[in-house]
Amino acid sequence: MNAFFKITLVVLSIGHVGCVSAQALAKGLAPQVRVHGLMWDAHEVSVGQVRQFAQQTGFVSQAEKDRGGFIYEAGWTQKMGWTWRAPFGKLAQDNEPAVHLTFDEAQQMCRFQGKRLPKDHEWVKAAYLEQRDQPPTGFQKGQRYTYPNGQSAHKSHCLNGCGNYQGTAPQGALWRGIGHVPVMTTSPGVNGLFDMGGNVWEWVDTGQGSEKMTRGGSWWYDADRQIESDVATKPKDTRVGYIGFRCVQDN
């Protein structure tokens, strides 16, 4: 077990997960919640966590090697300098979700911590089926919800049909949308997890050949992309500004 993993395991009750500061994330500190026998990252992996990983391993992402990741602007457009460090061309804060990372890069970071990317069936069960014995008001054990935030997407972050949040993209940087919000900005949803719906898509370890699935929708899409039946697949070397990830740990 490496030093990075030792400082990332901070277990909180899934009934109450408080705010995590950028300073804590810069040190690799991030909360986990237990859902159906797995320890889940309560939020998407942050820029601060990736920064820790890069400092300890010398990691350089494919987007960095290529001098920039991609965004869709009436066609895929490469953006020079847009990487996990600067997702919209401006240096990110440590508490922003890490994007512009491929499936293999995400899996590599999870495994470095003694974790892994979730399988699709694991992700779906955690996102839509409430499993807490005593969930807070608004959730009921055993109920399957339409959205990861409950019966509506109003407390998540997306293009239309979600909450009123301010994205981190500089004005004029994007052809569409306002970018992601820092992790744990929105309200916790089913099972106490943050941003399983909206903010950024999340890689899951399911797919055939060079294709892998993403789940949950993102800031670039409307709320209807957050529902359980919406299944998206992408080439696993995709590195764009609205796909991130979270890790799980087997008990």
Stretches with model-predicted labels:
Residues 2, 6, 11, 15, ...:
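Extended beta-strand/loop cores of jelly-roll/beta-sandwich
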Residues 60, 71, 78-99, 103-232, ...:
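Functional-site microenvironments in short loops/helix caps that host divalent-cation chemistry
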